[in-house]
Amino acid sequence: MRRVAWLLAAALLGLAVAWDFATATTFLGDDHLFRVFARLEANPLVAFASDKHGGEYYRPLPMLLWWLLERVSGGRAWVFALAAFVLHALCAGLVVVVGRRLGFAARTAVLAGCLFFAAPSEREAALWFAASTDLLAAAAVLGAVALFLDDRKWLRAFSVVLAAVAFLCKETTLVLPVLLAVARWFCAQNQGRPRSVRQCLRPTLPHCGVAVSYLIVRALVLRGLGGANDPLAPWWGRAVQLLAGLVHSVTAYGPLPEWVAWLAGVSLLVWAAAASRRRRALAGFALVWVMVTLVPLPVAGWVVGARYFYLPAVGLMLLLALALETTSALASVFAVALLLGFGLLSGHHRATEVRLYRQAVAAASAGVAEGLAHGHRLFFVSGGVKDLDLAIKLDKDMPEAVRGAVVIPDVPASFIWLPPEFADRLDFLLARPSLPPSGAYRFGEARLVGLARREEAPDLDEVLTRLPELRILRLGYKAGRFSVEDRTESYMRGRQ
């Protein structure tokens, strides 16, 4: 009877989390860049040998996954949502496996996996399709650690393969050899076996060799070190961002008020660290995992968003589960239910945003389609929708003529699919320094370029002076629906 109850609880947990993926997902932001790659590149393997990430990063495996999903799904979002759910569930399961290999009790390891699976921030990261980069990387890292700690040598060899997979997904996983050495150290300590730095480092040499090989290939493909041209936050700003990421990893990003998230998150982290001190070896591993996985994050410049903390959250959930180890089963169930409840609240909030976003894009698409029918090709759309040009051009219901048009949103640093005939005339609208660093994402014959950042963007009057044929569309929200209005004539009269 007890087993049936636990199986029922697990099924309810899975269904509750799956609900978010069914209702709160759509294509946003960088998702459109990956979709254009999948739509235009005939061979996805080209990302392994040439720069398809604008000189920023070398991450060919996630691009291969996106290519496959786009081709299989025909652009239907539910296929991407299903893949994201499976990846998130896989990572949660691997948290359990890693916990058991390290010596965590079965109940504690399972609890850590459930906490990770239910946590709002980790689910939020998984709900953004572009964060599949982070999910794939996390799955590969966790799998590599699990195999590395296995007693069978032939399985340990496969951890090197998974290390290569992790590196080809995201650069932050280059800390994997350190995680492997740390895992071996604490595993030996927990088992009361003698240990030395040399014994822990030697087995990681093949992984280090793969890391060096990856860096060489990356430099050759990107023709340099890569990286984004985004401005860097000051050192203290990045420190605050790291702390904020940890706090939100055990609470939620929204719709909780920030002060509530900080108060609850800091209290929870302090309590977990204090309550788990009696199991120093296991708690030490969890804390070191968090610190090691945080080390490469400040390189990003602005460390804002749940996706950055997906891998560090593994250590946080192991620490929380360890702190709950001596409590009753009811307390553990309550902890999972609390995170699940926060997640459902956050998911409902996001589902509303997704619904409004889809309505806004649909309304803008209708306005652009009407303009195209009248021979217009340049549009400015106010309404706060980033990368609107890409979203509209990826809509299969739009006329083919949209490929030769340009939709300029009022969101700085948005990306546009730039037709060759407009390249010179629209150059003044582009970011300086360029977005991406190489000047453009080049997929097939298409060029995707970033518009100016907020502080350098020209005002609308200057844009109209240079582009007098520009049509001005305005998105409005009234009576529960979005509509679009052509305000070109009224704006021109106001200028006169």
Predicted regions and their residues:
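Polytopic membrane enzymes that build or remodel cell-surface glycoconjugates and lipids
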Residues: 1-495
